[in-house]
Amino acid sequence: MATTSEKTTDDGLVRSMLSDESIQLMRDRIGYPNPTVRTGFTDEPWNTIATADAMRRFSYCIGDDNPLYCDPEYAKNTRWGQTIAPPAFEKSMGIMGNRMFDDPEFEKETSKALRGVQLFHSGGENFYWAPITEGVKLWRSRYVKQVDVKESEYAGRSAIVTNGLCMWDENDKVYVDGVDWFVHAERKKRTDASKDKYAKEEPAFYTDEEMKEIEDCYDNEYRRGADTLYYEDVEVGTSLPKMVKGPFQITDLINMHMGTGWILYGCWPNRLAYEGRKKLRGFYTRDEFNAWDSLQRVHWDKDLAEKVGVKMMYDIGAVRQFHVSNFLTNYAGDDAFIHRIKFEFRRFNYTGDVTWMTGEIVDKRIDPKLGPVIEVVLRGTNQRGNDNINATSTIMVASREHGPVKLPEPPAPTPYRRKTP
C-alpha cells in the first residue's frame, strides 16, 4: 500500500516525501537489513567461491592488469604463494547471511522505510583482515547501523543511512568488515539553478592535447610490484605517483558489471527481469518503449537521471572505490597489505569525466597491533578541478627491523547475521 505522501508517475516512477515517519521506519530497522539495499530475482552472489579466473576477470574489468591478481604463475612466487584478490573484489562475493526477522509484521511495516526516494552511494570504510585467495567462500551480512538527517541547500532534506557490512567464511573467520553510507533524497528535477551547485557543470570535451596528457599518464603508470616497500624507506610528506582514470564511458560501466555482477539489485534479462520486478516493483519504471526497465539505468539514461535530480548520466560509486583500490595497490606493491580504506564520493562522476588520482603519505608508525604501518590520504580530481573522491588508507608494510607483514587478528563476526550452515 502506498503511503499518503507517495505518488507514482505515468512511467511508474515512485516519488515520496522524505517524511519523519519514513525516517523512523528506517531507524526501526537498526540491526536488520536495509529494505532499500536488497537483491532482486536471486540472492546468489556473482562469485560464490573465489577462483583465479574470477580474480583475473575482476581486475581486468576495473582496468587493473597487476600480475599479482591476474597471473597465477607470477603470484605463486610472491609471499602469498598464489593468486590473491585486490581490495574491493569482495563486492562480487557474499552468500546471503543477513539477519532473519522474527516478526513478519515488523518486517512488512518497516519495508516501507524511505520508499520512493532516490538513493546515492556516498562512500564507506572497509577493514581487511586477510587476502581473499583461491577457494575462499564468503557469507555476507548487511544491516542498518545509524540514520541521520541532513539539510542542504542543494538537496534540501536528506537521510544518511550508515549500513554495516561483515563478510566471513565457513569457520567464522572475518575477511572484511566496515560500513557503507547512502544518501536518500527526494526525486525531483532541479528547477532553481541558483541553488544547484552542479548547474554550471557542462559535459566533458577534450582537445587532442588533453587526450595526449591522459594517454601519457597511462603510459607512465607506476606499479611497485616485487620491489618491496620498507617502512624504513618511507618518508612522511612523500607524494605518491599520479594515476589517471577515464574519461569515464558506458563501456567502463559494462566492464565493471562484467567483473562484479550487479552488486546489489540484480538487473537480469527477459523472464528473469519480470521475476525481479515482482520482488522489487519500485525499482522498475517504463522506458521510451513503454516497457519496464530497472532504475539502474540512471547511470546510462540521461532522461531518467534528470528525473531523479541529476544533471547527466553518472557512475556507480563502486567505480571510484575500485580506482582507490588500484591506486593504493600499485603503490604498496606485492609485499604490503591494505588494511583499511575509507572513501568518500564528493561529487557526481559524469559520463565523460576524467579522474586524476594523487596521494601523500601523512604518517608512519609502529602500531601495537598492526606493526609497521603508513597512513595515506588521496584524492581524485576531475577535469573541472573538483574533487570527486577523497580517501584515506592504512597500509601494513614490511620492515627490515620487524620483518614481513603479519596479518592482523580479525574480530568476531557481527551478531546481526544468520549462522553459517
Model-based region annotation:
Residues 175-178, 241, 389:
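A structural microfeature
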Residues 2-123, 189-335, 400-421:
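Hot-dog-fold acyl-thioester-processing enzymes
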Residues 158-168, 174, 178-200, 394-401:
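Flexible glycine-rich active-site/ligand-binding loops centered on an Asp-His dyad
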Residues 181-182, 351, 358-366, 373-378, ...:
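Ligand-binding pocket scaffold of soluble enzyme catalytic domains
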Residues 122-171, 179, 337-383:
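Hydrophobic beta-sheet segments that form the core/acyl-binding groove
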Residues 172-174, 238, 386:
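Residue-level signal for well-ordered, solvent-exposed loop/turn and beta-edge residues enriched
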Residues 57, 89-90, 125, 179, ...:
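Generic structural signal for residues positioned in beta-strands
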Residues 91-92, 127, 181-183, 243, ...:
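Residues in well-ordered beta-strands of folded domains
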